[in-house]
Amino acid sequence: MDYDRRYAAVILVVLSMFLHILHSLPDGDFIIQGCPECKLKENKYFSKGGAPIYQCMGCCFSRAYPTPARSKKTMLVPKNITSEATCCVAKSFTKATVMGNARVENHTECHCSTCYYHKS
């Protein structure tokens, strides 16, 4: 009986230490390793011709929530979870001509917004 109490006490101490360490880390520390925030980054390929060309690059996050019952009824393949993804896109941009006659967008401001183009 005394052995069981010590065993339970050790488990509780280890669990509380683990929770303390996990709680003290910044939010999302394990999730976003190596993924920078959504911001402007110089495009080295298009910047060769003179003026720098900037593109929005980085990570945004998605959210998931339970699918509302009325929406589930209209789905061909009903799903319990609905997800909404956001992508790093230009909030504003200017048109620029590079490499003679190629027109590109030179991004001036970025934000996370609805994804319109998905990779297949």
From Swiss-Prot:
Q: Which residues form the signal peptide?
A: 1-24
Q: Name one GO molecular function term.
A: follicle-stimulating hormone activity
Q: Name the UniProt key words of this record, in alphabetical order.
A: Disulfide bond, Glycoprotein, Hormone, Secreted, Signal
Q: Tell me which InterPro entries the record gives.
A: Cystine-knot_cytokine, Glyco_hormone
Q: List the disulfide bonds.
A: 35-59, 38-88, 56-110, 60-112, 87-115
Under SUPFAM superfamilies, the record lists: Cystine-knot cytokines (SSF57501)
Q: What is its main location?
A: secreted
Q: Name one GO biological process term.
A: regulation of signaling receptor activity
Query: Where does this protein reside within or beyond the cell?
Result: Secreted
Q: Which GO terms describe its cellular component?
A: extracellular space; follicle-stimulating hormone complex
Q: Glycosylation: which residues?
A: 80, 106
The record's note on quaternary structure and interaction partners says: Heterodimer. The active hormones thyrotropin, lutropin and follitropin are heterodimers composed of CGA, a common alpha chain described here and a unique beta chain which confers their biological specificity to the hormones: TSHB for thyrotropin, LHB for lutropin and FSHB for follitropin.
* Stated role: Shared alpha chain of the active heterodimeric glycoprotein hormones thyrotropin/thyroid stimulating hormone/TSH, lutropin/luteinizing hormone/LH and follitropin/follicle stimulating hormone/FSH. These hormones bind specific receptors on target cells that in turn activate downstream signaling pathways.
Q: Which family does it belong to?
A: Belongs to the glycoprotein hormones subunit alpha family.
Name the PANTHER family on file. Answer: GLYCOPROTEIN HORMONE ALPHA CHAIN, GLYCOPROTEIN HORMONES ALPHA CHAIN
Question: What name has this protein been given in UniProt?
Answer: Glycoprotein hormones alpha chain
- Origin organism of this chain? Meriones unguiculatus (Mongolian jird)
The major lineage groups are: Eukaryota, Metazoa, Chordata, Craniata, Vertebrata
Gene, per the UniProt record: CGA
